[in-house]
Regions:
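Accessory alpha-helical/coil subdomains and C-terminal extensions
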Residues: 1-56, 140-141
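ATP/nucleoside-binding phosphotransfer catalytic cores, i.e., glycine-rich phosphate-binding loops
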Residues: 59-141
């Protein structure tokens, strides 16, 4: 028994075999030390931040985070959430709202953390083949 009928695919199929595994997931917790951020920004192409609630990071690391975003503008930063069914919205809390002013980052909104990780690894590994701007690719494919 099939619940979802198969739909024939008529377009040409493209296979992308490259993944950029230089992606780091950092989970925001109370008491996180700012010094860990520098190491992450220095060593990874993408930093996925699993933030508090729908969009919060601790005030204690906010200034360091802003500075590192400025110092490493080529790093892709994606803000995600620990709240499974609400998605991310960085404008809800003051720190997140300020981050939108000072840092360039993408938001996962309603994407699961697993899909964000897979998508980012795929995007960065196939950047040239995909062409275009990473933000457009992240939100469209």
């Amino acid at each position: 028994m099939r619940y979802i009928p198969p739909v024939p695919y008529e377009e040409e199929v493209w296979f992308y075999e490259e993944l950029d595994e230089n992606v780091y997931l950092i989970k925001m917790i109370p008491g996180i030390k700012p010094r860990i951020l520098r190491s992450v920004f220095e060593n990874y192409d993408c930093i996925i931040v699993e933030s508090f609630g729908v969009g919060g990071i601790p005030q204690s690391i906010a200034d360091d985070f802003y500075k590192l975003c400025q110092e490493f503008p080529d790093r892709l930063v994606v803000m995600s959430t620990q709240v499974a069914h609400e998605g991310s919205d960085m404008t809800v809390y003051e720190v997140g709202h300020d981050m939108k002013k000072y840092c360039r980052f993408l938001e996962s909104y309603d994407m699961t953390l697993e899909s964000v990780i897979a998508k980012v690894m795929w995007m960065l590994g196939n950047r040239e083949a995909l062409g275009g701007n990473l933000e457009d690719i992240f939100y469209s494919k």
